[in-house]
């Protein structure tokens, strides 16, 4: 598909706009891959290669709901990418929200898994009224093409508690940092639509923009992301998977439909964006 080719080329092209500014494209994606549930319509063993292929051409990917053996599979299926992340339980097991990146483009400066809770540095801790631990994987990179620093966060918010999501918004807003020359990118399943108070607060507190709203081009006038495995449910799917950015322009965004044996390869659609970052 043409958008996959575009994603595969992202990061390799410098886009001249004005005589004094050079912009570099960076392909980013977020994908809730669905934890490995043997009762699912399409089992992980039958879809993990397609999951990896759906995002293989992008420079930065935030995954969600990745169990340890699923992380092993993604690393094996994406050998050209580097990765960082661990599970949400105290012992490192459970679902992870790892970050994958193109090491030929991005230098990894450091990363940390933080829990979405007031005691965010206590592994396995619960936040506010959440019934499960939730995490954010926070990574810093140097972009060799633009000379800019990137602050990247992959996260998966609570699906039950407004209070927990609002608390998570406050934490992540701070974790994006306040370096005016750095680019901040939040990738995640926030379990809330863009108009929800918690998402609006995250964008306001951290001066982030929703790529869906600000992209120069969007593949469809409107789309949802939490589709279930069944294509028939897409029309009513809420848009709860988001890419939020600060310090970059957005040329293009789309939620991609990948089908195997008549069903989607996850219960969420992967969302990608082509960002443009000015040269430092």
Name these PLM-found stretches.
Residues 9-77, 88-95, 277-280:
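N-terminal, active-site-proximal structural segment of metallo-dependent hydrolase catalytic domains
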Residues 33-36, 67-70, 88-92, 105-106, ...:
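Solvent-exposed loop/turn segments at secondary-structure junctions
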Residues 26-33, 51-74, 100, 139, ...:
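Active-site beta-strand/loop signature of hydrolases that rely on acidic residues for catalysis
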């Amino acid at each position: 598909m043409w958008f996959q080719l575009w994603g595969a080329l992202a990061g390799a092209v410098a886009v001249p706009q004005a005589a004094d500014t050079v912009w570099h494209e960076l392909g980013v994606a977020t994908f809730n891959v669905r934890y490995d549930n043997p009762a699912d319509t399409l089992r992980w063993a039958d879809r993990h290669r397609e999951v990896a292929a759906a995002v293989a051409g992008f420079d930065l990917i935030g995954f969600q709901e990745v169990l340890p053996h699923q992380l092993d599979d993604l690393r094996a299926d994406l050998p050209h990418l580097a990765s960082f992340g661990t599970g949400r339980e105290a012992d490192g097991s459970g679902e992870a929200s790892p970050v994958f990146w193109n090491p030929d483009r991005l230098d990894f400066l450091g990363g940390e898994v933080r829990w979405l809770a007031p005691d965010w540095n206590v592994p396995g801790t619960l936040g506010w009224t959440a019934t499960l631990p939730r995490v954010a994987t926070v990574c810093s990179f140097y972009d060799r093409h633009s000379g800019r620093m990137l602050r990247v966060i992959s996260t998966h918010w609570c699906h039950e508690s407004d209070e927990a999501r609002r608390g998570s918004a406050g934490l992540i807003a701070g974790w994006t940092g306040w370096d005016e020359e750095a680019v901040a990118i939040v990738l995640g399943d926030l379990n809330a639509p863009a108009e929800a108070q918690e998402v609006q607060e995250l964008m306001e507190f951290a001066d982030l923009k929703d790529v869906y709203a600000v992209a120069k081009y969007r593949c469809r006038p409107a789309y949802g992301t939490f589709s279930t495995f069944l294509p028939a449910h897409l029309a009513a799917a809420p848009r709860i998977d988001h890419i939020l950015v600060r310090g970059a322009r957005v040329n293009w965004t789309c939620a991609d439909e990948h089908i195997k044996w008549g069903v989607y390869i996850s219960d969420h659609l992967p969302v990608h964006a082509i960002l443009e970052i000015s040269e430092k």
